[in-house]
Structures are given as C-alpha cells and as structure tokens.
C-alpha cells in the first residue's frame, strides 16, 4: 500500500513539474516578473488589510444582502403567511438599510465602499434554504433569521461603541432598535 502511494505521489509530482512553462530565453523581463513576488509599492491582494470600519461596512452590507436573498426565497418557498409577511418586511427594511449604509460609508475619509458579498457561511445557509420548502423551509428560515439578526446586532453594538467613523457609528446606533425588533420578530416565527 505504501509502495502504491509513493508511486502515485511521484507520478503526480513529475506531471506537475512537466507542466511548468518556461519563458523564452530572450524574455528576461517576463522571467524576472514571474519570479519576483515582491514588486516595490505593490501589495499582493491577499495581504491587503481592511480597516475595522471597512470590515464593519462589509459585514453590514453582507448581512443586508443575506436578509434580502433569503427573504426573496421565502416569498416562493414559505408555507406560513406569517413567514411570508415577515420576509416582505425584511426585504423592505434591508433595502433601506443598504441605502443608509452606503450613504454613511461615503461620508468616511477615505471613502468606504461596502462590499455586499455574502460570507461562505451565509452562502451555505442560502443554498440549504433553496433545497427546502413548506414547513421545513419555514423552520429553517426562522432559525437563519434569528442567527443572522443576532450576529448583525452584535456587530452594530460593537461598532456603535468602538467605531472610528462618525457616519458609520451613527448608522450603527440608528439601526440597533430596528435590528432588535427584527430579532424578536424572528424568534416568534
């Protein structure tokens, strides 16, 4: 068994080594650029640090995107009228919240642009919800809403007390009562 594994690893290593594309000998610039991973003045994207305010704005934007996407799904898949009504309220509230966030973030210097890309966890929950319907969907949607609103509430409270951009602090403070109400409504679904 060990012999077979060793052979398989060796074959894979040789195959990868054979895939290496060499730059033409006369193309010293291409060779230099391909091997020089530290170009002065350029920070690789993976190493760029986001400010705490950018992280907060991205978290809030992703939360809004998640709430809207899952609530749009509820319009089709939910069986309970109460869940459907709640979902419509969430679409409206989080669309408005997104606009307020963008306005607050634009007041920052330098300007902050919220990234509404959902986290892997949010995408997974959305994917899981897409596979459910009826009462099963209602139960999973309600649980997702409780968890999402609790996380958002925690982020808002933390930024409201410790944030460093006045516009975003005001946004966080303003949103706490609404998100608290949504959290309590979600617990009642």
Model-derived features: positions:
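His/Met- and acidic-residue-enriched segments that coordinate or traffic transition-metal cofactors
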Residues: 2-9, 13-189
């Amino acid at each position: 068994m060990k012999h077979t594994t060793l052979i398989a690893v060796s074959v894979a290593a040789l195959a990868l080594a054979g895939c290496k594309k060499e730059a033409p000998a006369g193309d010293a610039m291409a060779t230099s650029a391909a091997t020089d991973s530290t170009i002065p003045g350029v920070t690789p994207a993976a190493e760029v640090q986001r400010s705490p305010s950018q992280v907060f704005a991205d978290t809030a934007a992703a939360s809004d995107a998640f709430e809207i996407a899952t609530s749009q799904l509820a319009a089709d898949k939910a069986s309970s009228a109460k869940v459907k009504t709640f979902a419509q309220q969430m679409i409206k509230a989080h669309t408005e919240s997104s606009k307020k966030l963008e306005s607050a973030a634009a007041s920052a210097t330098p300007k902050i642009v919220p990234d509404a890309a959902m986290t892997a966890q949010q995408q997974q929950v959305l994917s899981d919800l897409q596979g459910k319907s009826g009462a099963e969907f209602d139960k999973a949607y309600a649980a997702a809403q409780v968890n999402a609103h609790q996380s958002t509430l925690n982020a808002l409270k933390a930024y409201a007390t410790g944030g460093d951009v006045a516009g975003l602090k005001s946004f966080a403070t303003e949103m706490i009562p609404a998100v608290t109400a949504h959290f309590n409504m979600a617990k009642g679904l």
